[in-house]
Amino acid sequence: MELALSLGDNTKKQFSFMEKNSKINNPSVSSTSTSEKDLGFCMALDVAFGGHRSLSSSSSPSVEDEKKKPAPRAKKSDEFRVSSSVDPPLQLQLHFPNWLPENSKGRQGGRMPLGAATVVEEEEEEEEAVPSMSVSPPDSVTSSFQLDFGIKSYGYERRSNKRDIDDEVERSASRASNEDNDDENGSTRKKLRLSKDQSAFLEDSFKEHSTLNPKQKIALAKQLNLRPRQVEVWFQNRRARTKLKQTEVDCEYLKRCCESLTEENRRLQKEVKELRTLKTSTPFYMQLPATTLTMCPSCERVATSAAQPSTSAAHNLCLSTSSLIPVKPRPAKQVS
């Protein structure tokens, strides 16, 4: 990135961020040079990548000298670098106002020229004009501030391609080793093929005893023309199948028990709900008061049992047959 600054003249001088110390040590030279120039102000900003530009304090040569110089040939090392942008650099032009005194406008007919545009040329031409501030020699293409994206990206691609190739080789080797292992296992571990007679004899032996001692195993292997290891493996598999079947039967039994318990629980919950409903609802029958005297409406008089036995009998019959209505008790009449 460069920052070019000019004051009103047509010279294409650029001022970068890293100025020489000579300009700072000799302020008189800079003051005299600026006094002879117009008060125009121009600032240019240039950004370049790859091997085209680098940060260095340099003053560009004149346009005529640059046109006379032959174009430098691109080096082989620059083939992978990103080409720099063709767009012109950004420029900022500032003019002084008209209220300044006329003697400060310069010596060019009282007119202040516009800011001179800085032209960015090739790096080799710039470095030949003014030496760079970097550690590398002036005519070198690269510097410490150069951003070389092309070579970095190319190197990254090469490393990634190499890594992919190595991974592919490892995967192919692992597949080959797995296939070899499978072939070896297949040759050594073949499935045992038994005839019907051998299977029936082994089944009968398993019903008698599910486990075999070494002597029984050897005798059974000789009788069936098999190896002792094959007989042992058959018994192990038969015990595993028996255990699996028993486990399946137990699971089915537990499943049925769980279903029956679920149905019973649902029925009990339904009964509890019905009982709670009956408890909270009103009763269907009417309760009679405890301390009331009931009397038949046809019997208005109460007589003693000795005086009128027939009347009391009729009264009792009436109480048993007629409807009962609660009435208030009356005092008994005295018979004179």
UniProtKB/Swiss-Prot annotation:
| DNA-binding region(s), residue ranges | 187-246
Cited InterPro entries? HD, HD-ZIP_Homeobox_LZ_Class_II, Homeobox_CS, Homeodomain-like_sf, Leu_zip_homeo
Q: Which GO terms describe its cellular component?
A: nucleus
Which PROSITE patterns does the entry link to? HOMEOBOX_1 (PS00027), HOMEOBOX_2 (PS50071)
Compositional bias ranges of the Low complexity kind: 130-141
Molecular function via GO: DNA-binding transcription factor activity; DNA-binding transcription factor activity, RNA polymerase II-specific; transcription cis-regulatory region binding
User: From which domain of life does this come?
Assistant: Eukaryota
Region called Leucine-zipper, residue ranges: 254-275
Q: Which SUPFAM superfamilies match?
A: Homeodomain-like
State the UniProt keywords alphabetically.
DNA-binding, Homeobox, Nucleus, Transcription, Transcription regulation
Q: Where is the composition biased (Acidic residues)?
A: 120-129
For this protein, the record's Gene3D superfamilies field holds:
Homeodomain-like
Q: What is its main location?
A: nucleus
One Pfam family, short name please?
Answer: Homeodomain
- Region Disordered: which residues? 53-141, 160-194
**Where is the protein found, in the record's own terms?**
Nucleus
Q: Basic and acidic residues bias located where?
A: 64-81, 160-173
Recorded hits in PANTHER family, A to Z, give: HOMEOBOX-LEUCINE ZIPPER PROTEIN HAT14 (PTHR45714:SF39)
Family membership noted in the UniProt record: Belongs to the HD-ZIP homeobox family. Class II subfamily.
What is the protein's known function? Answer: Probable transcription factor.
Q: What is this protein called?
A: Homeobox-leucine zipper protein HAT14
Give the taxonomic lineage as stored in the record. Eukaryota, Viridiplantae, Streptophyta, Embryophyta, Tracheophyta
